[in-house]
Amino acid sequence: MRVILAPMEGVVDDLMRDILSSINPYDLLVTEFVRVVDQLLPEKVFLKLCPELLSGGYTPSGTPVRVQLLGQEPNCMAENAMRAIELGSHGVDANFGCPAKMVNRSNGGAVLLQYPNTIHDIVRAMRQAVPAEHPVTAKIRLGYEDKSLFMENALAVYEAGATELAIHARSKVDGYKPPAYWEYITEVRERLPIPVIANGEIWNRDDAKRCMQVTGCDSIMIGRGAISLPNLADTIKTGATPYSWADTLQLMLSYTQRELSGRKSDYYPARIKQWFSYLNRQYPEADTLFRELRIYKTTEEIVRVLEQAQHHLNQ
């Protein structure tokens, strides 16, 4: 079984990858997307989104990281795929699933699910540019407005030479609304000879088991669930006990220390509030604490609330 951390734009940055890989036995982490338009991007763009490239493409805990690209022009995607590999990325992934309106309006992400030939051309160009020993992968949804082109898109990725395919079991229009339609993944997994990775609505170990039973996949990708329950991958792979609220609060304080000592400290209030929006699903205590700290705007005020909460737990 493989468990892969999904790319989540604006959520799973290098610090979050560091934190989560330090407490989970992830097999692979995928970055937020690098936006490719019409040129070969400078190294600094890749290093900003994936500073792990400076350490051989690994997090401090030794988990490999794969750069994800988002774009619509095959040759530019190919050039930038090769650059990612040269910089140390463990393979390169193509994003055909992002549902964000701003991205779709500029012909990126899930909007390309309406054009299987374009998907094929992009993956084909990337595969031809990247040496065979390096994986070229793709992530798709079930479709854009409907699921009518789902199998055609999956075949386009495979026939273009992709190493494996991750599928988020919802369409663009579905967004993130439950349920996830895992049964569609089953059809592709039975038809394609390459590994298929199942993604969508995996919030706990039982969800992971059901997803693998329905799809027949032995690889899963987790995103929002991994932020909601920080040690989700560990519970899935080893049967570890899910983190208690005390465990999670301590992890948040560890995250806080790293955030404030790094380059992103100005963004801390927004980042920590965003994390609380995911934790609310798993921990009632998170909702209570968020109601207290949401009125604060400064880092100092928020850190004080978190430290007070931990102090009360330890009494």
Curated annotation (Swiss-Prot):
Active site positions: 98 (proton donor)
Key words, A-Z: Flavoprotein, FMN, NADP, Oxidoreductase, RNA-binding, tRNA processing, tRNA-binding
Co-factor(s): FMN
Binding site for FMN: 7-9, 68, 139, 199-201, 223-224
Keyword Flavoprotein: yes
Site feature (Interacts with tRNA) residues: 35, 95, 176, 271, 273, 278, 294
Catalytic reaction list: 5,6-dihydrouridine(16) in tRNA + NADP(+) = uridine(16) in tRNA + NADPH + H(+); 5,6-dihydrouridine(16) in tRNA + NAD(+) = uridine(16) in tRNA + NADH + H(+)
This enzyme's EC code(s): 1.3.1.-
Tagged with keyword Repressor: no
GO MF annotation terms: flavin adenine dinucleotide binding; FMN binding; tRNA binding; tRNA-dihydrouridine16 synthase activity
Pfam family membership, one: Dus
Enzyme class, first EC level, given as a word: oxidoreductase
Entry function: Catalyzes the synthesis of 5,6-dihydrouridine (D), a modified base found in the D-loop of most tRNAs, via the reduction of the C5-C6 double bond in target uridines. Specifically modifies U16 in tRNAs.
Family: Belongs to the Dus family. DusC subfamily.
Family matches, as PANTHER family: TRNA-DIHYDROURIDINE SYNTHASE (PTHR11082), TRNA-DIHYDROURIDINE(16) SYNTHASE (PTHR11082:SF26)
Protein name: tRNA-dihydrouridine(16) synthase
